[in-house]
Amino acid sequence: MQNVFNTVKGKALEVAEYLTPVLKESKFKETGVITPEEFLAAGDHLVHHCPTWQWSAGEESKIKPYLPNDKQFLMTKNVPCYKRCKQMEYSDEQEAIIEEDDGDGGWVDTFHHTGLSGVTEAVKEITLETQDCGKTTDNIAVCDDDDDDEGEAADMEDYEESGLLENDDATVDTSKIKEACKPKADLGGEDAILQTRTYDLYITYDKYYQTPRLWLFGYDEQRRPLAVENMYEDISQDHVKKTVTIENHPHLPPPPMCSVHPCRHAEVMKKIIETVAEGGGELGVHMYLLIFLKFVQAVIPTIEYDYTRHFTM
């Protein structure tokens, strides 16, 4: 039933997006939405600091006229996913309800990281260090689920003030991925089953919601496409079929992909902007995608995509 509802809703939103005029005046600070021009600026900033991300044109027949032909969307490929979400340690104390009034019980950050510095000291200045984001494609940021999973549940403000924007120096050399993907025939039993998967991730501009939108498609260790049920194993179960739905990519041919629905993105970003402003700082729109990739990690906590970890509020 949920799949049928999502399909009908998706078709309705396609029509609504087609009829929605292109946003031309910036409303980033007021509402958290962005114009296509601001999406381009944020995308250029992401590509500059995280070279594993690149602009792409997609299919010529699906080009959106409000974006340059060669900058229709962003993509990063062969992103490692070493384990399934159910393999992560989890308890109710780690949940944080991000939004409660969306009709689906809120956006739950199942693997919320706590124990970080508060907003009083942190929301004073935005700094960006670029040396650890990967000047080559050999460096991919690692999900820091090993050390930060302990602590009490936090509310929306705690999530925005610290959990989204914490410092993290961890990186991994992707040259190890090839070695990890070799069959381990000598182990025997369940240990011989290779867990590593890879994902292609895409960020598009959603004209209806006027925010970025994340798409992902997964492959097994032999680079064979994963079934939808298999991809759901790498998504927080609180978000499957709710925050995450299966839809056609707006710029690429089938098969359909998993997509993180953008209906809450602007609201979350607006609250982050307000938090920064309350601390005397100012969040530039060019930082949008870096922060966006940070907060959607709650949905796909085991997919280790690249984004700048070295920015503090």
From Swiss-Prot:
Post-translational changes noted in the entry: Conjugated to ATG12 at Lys-242. ATG12-conjugation plays a role in regulation of mitochondrial homeostasis and cell death, while it is not involved in phosphatidylethanolamine-conjugation to ATG8-like proteins and autophagy.
Source organism, top-level taxon: Eukaryota
Extent of the signal sequence: none
Residue location of crosslink Glycyl lysine isopeptide (Lys-Gly) (interchain with G-Cter in ATG12): 242
GO BP, sorted A to Z: autophagosome assembly; autophagy; autophagy of mitochondrion; glycophagy; mitochondrial fragmentation involved in apoptotic process; nucleophagy; protein transport
Residues annotated as catalytic: 263
Main location class: cytoplasm
Compartment(s): Cytoplasm
Alphabetically ordered keywords of this record: Autophagy, Cytoplasm, Isopeptide bond, Protein transport, Transferase, Transport, Ubl conjugation, Ubl conjugation pathway
Pfam families linked: Autophagy_act_C
Motif segment (LIR motif): 104-110
GO MF entries: Atg12 transferase activity; Atg8-family conjugating enzyme activity; Atg8-family ligase activity
EC annotation from Swiss-Prot or TrEMBL: 2.3.2.-
Ranges spanned by the short sequence motif Membrane-curvature-sensing motif, renumbered to the chain: 4-19
Any one of the GO CC terms: cytosol
Stated role: E2 conjugating enzyme that catalyzes the covalent conjugation of the C-terminal Gly of ATG8-like proteins (GABARAP, GABARAPL1, GABARAPL2 or MAP1LC3A) to the amino group of phosphatidylethanolamine (PE)-containing lipids in the membrane resulting in membrane-bound ATG8-like proteins which is one of the key steps in the development of autophagic isolation membranes during autophagosome formation. Cycles back and forth between binding to ATG7 for loading with the ATG8-like proteins and binding to E3 enzyme, composed of ATG12, ATG5 and ATG16L1 to promote ATG8-like proteins lipidation.
PANTHER family: UBIQUITIN-LIKE-CONJUGATING ENZYME ATG3
Listed name of the protein: Ubiquitin-like-conjugating enzyme ATG3
Species of origin: Xenopus laevis
